[in-house]
């Protein structure tokens, strides 16, 4: 039996961290959405109890370091399942880019195995299990515009974003999320994004309010080490994006445009400066 699951990339329209838990986990306050740049995850039953991971990327491990592998282990343990699976991942999302590719692949594994093994778990349970793999997995289980709080485990769906176009641009660097998070100093955070105003803008479908209140508290940390991030951000705004910022821990920067024609111009202009550029739209996975 074979199951195929789509694993969309995510971006952070708003990203704030409020404090650190005693175990080192961050307390998050984020607004996230998924876009139509996606990996595809194929699951095949095995006659043995093995977990096999096959990818078309030379940058990904195929053992227990892979988040998709970990997702299988968590689900097997929770449901007391003794079955094997081969996971084939067709990558489109750049690796170590701040776009949640590994987490989305892991979430796709949870959704797909839930179907393949007839486990009948709801998305809330899958999201709770996903937190054992990575803090972005609970959101990626849903993969729809949402307000994400707690350790990443409290996912509150939001209305669809108003129609907009998004230009993603990844500089030629890869970022280690743990390294960036270790550098967070709460006493030195000068400016927190106004997440409440961003949420209000989405509720009201108000472009100006959304664009004015986007923000990522981690951007200064990553950009200090990788100045290319601010260069790309400036280029996005110069070429006509309505707003621009870094996604996640970076290094991918995205610009947003209300109109497709302007987004296409920004995309075409940026292609001359950055090799990995994508023109995408917001997507809610449950609509496909």
UniProtKB/Swiss-Prot annotation:
The active site is at residues 10, 136. ATP binds at residues 94-104. It comes from Lactiplantibacillus plantarum (strain ATCC BAA-793 / NCIMB 8826 / WCFS1) (Lactobacillus plantarum). One of its GO terms (molecular function) is ATP binding. NCBIfam families: ispE. Keywords: ATP-binding, Isoprene biosynthesis, Kinase, Nucleotide-binding, Transferase. Pfam families: GHMP_kinases_C, GHMP_kinases_N. Its EC number is 2.7.1.148. This is 4-diphosphocytidyl-2-C-methyl-D-erythritol kinase. It catalyses: 4-CDP-2-C-methyl-D-erythritol + ATP = 4-CDP-2-C-methyl-D-erythritol 2-phosphate + ADP + H(+). Belongs to the GHMP kinase family. IspE subfamily. Pathway: Isoprenoid biosynthesis; isopentenyl diphosphate biosynthesis via DXP pathway; isopentenyl diphosphate from 1-deoxy-D-xylulose 5-phosphate: step 3/6. It is an enzyme of class 2 (transferase). One of its GO terms (biological process) is isopentenyl diphosphate biosynthetic process, methylerythritol 4-phosphate pathway. Catalyzes the phosphorylation of the position 2 hydroxy group of 4-diphosphocytidyl-2C-methyl-D-erythritol. InterPro entries: GHMP_kinase_C_dom (IPR013750), GHMP_kinase_C_sf (IPR036554), GHMP_kinase_N_dom (IPR006204), IspE (IPR004424), Ribosomal_Su5_D2-typ_SF (IPR020568), Ribsml_uS5_D2-typ_fold_subgr (IPR014721).
């Amino acid at each position: 039996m074979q199951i195929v699951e789509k694993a969309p990339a995510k971006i952070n329209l708003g990203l704030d961290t409020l404090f650190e838990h005693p175990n080192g986990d961050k307390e998050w306050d984020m607004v996230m959405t998924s876009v139509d740049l996606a990996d595809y995850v194929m699951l095949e039953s095995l006659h043995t109890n093995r977990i096999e991971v096959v990818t078309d990327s030379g940058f990904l491990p195929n053992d227990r370091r892979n988040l998709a592998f970990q997702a299988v282990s968590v689900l097997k343990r929770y449901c007391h399942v003794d079955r094997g699976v081969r996971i084939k991942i067709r990558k489109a999302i750049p690796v170590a880019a701040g776009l949640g590719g590994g987490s989305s692949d892991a979430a796709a594994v949870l959704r797909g195995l839930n179907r393949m093994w007839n486990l009948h778990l709801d998305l809330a349970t899958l999201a709770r299990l996903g937190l054992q793999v990575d803090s972005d997995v609970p959101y990626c289980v849903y993969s729809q515009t949402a307000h994400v709080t707690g350790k990443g485990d409290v996912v509150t769906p939001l209305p669809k974003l108003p129609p907009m176009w998004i230009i993603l641009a990844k500089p030629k660097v890869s970022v280690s999320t743990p390294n960036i998070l270790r550098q967070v100093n709460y006493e030195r955070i000068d400016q927190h994004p106004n997440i409440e105003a961003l949420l209000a803008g989405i509720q009201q479908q108000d472009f100006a309010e959304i664009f004015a209140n986007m923000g990522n508290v981690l951007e200064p940390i990553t950009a200090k080490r990788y100045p290319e991030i601010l260069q790309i951000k400036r280029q996005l705004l110069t070429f006509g994006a309505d707003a621009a910022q870094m996604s996640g821990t970076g290094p991918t920067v995205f610009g947003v445009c209300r109109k497709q024609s302007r987004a296409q111009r920004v995309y075409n202009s940026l292609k001359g400066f950055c090799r990995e550029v994508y023109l995408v739209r917001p997507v809610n996975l449950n609509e496909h």
